[in-house]
């Protein structure tokens, strides 16, 4: 299994509607991309105060690295990317991606 983790610094004026649309777009990728097993999206709820400005995040569980690689260039993923960019804060490091 491969866990693809994405942290987002969303614009301060992000609306509840935009948040729901983003969640829906991400979760809808399940069943469309081979090997993508699960997508979880949420806003930061940590009480620790160590989020460094990251307000939202999601993770995706893939069967293996090959499935993750398919996702990276998959047309359905490419359709979601512009919406993610639209809700990001206007700063150079508004997104962080790691795979485990």
Which stretches of residues belong to each language-model region?
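A common structural junction motif
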Residues: 27-30, 76-82, 88
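Charge-dense polyanion-binding interfaces
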Residues: 83-100
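Short S/T/G/P-rich N-terminal loop/turn motif that feeds into the first structured element of a domain
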Residues: 1-55, 63-73, 96-100
């Amino acid at each position: 299994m491969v866990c693809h983790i994405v942290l987002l610094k969303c614009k301060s004026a992000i609306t509840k509607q935009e948040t729901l649309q983003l969640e829906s777009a991400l979760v809808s990728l399940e069943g469309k991309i081979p090997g993508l097993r699960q997508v979880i999206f949420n806003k930061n709820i940590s009480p620790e105060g160590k989020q460094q400005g990251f307000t939202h995040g999601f993770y995706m569980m893939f069967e293996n690295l090959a499935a993750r690689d398919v996702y990276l260039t998959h047309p359905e993923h490419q359709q979601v990317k512009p919406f993610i960019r639209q809700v990001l804060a206007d700063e150079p490091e508004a997104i962080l991606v790691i795979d485990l």
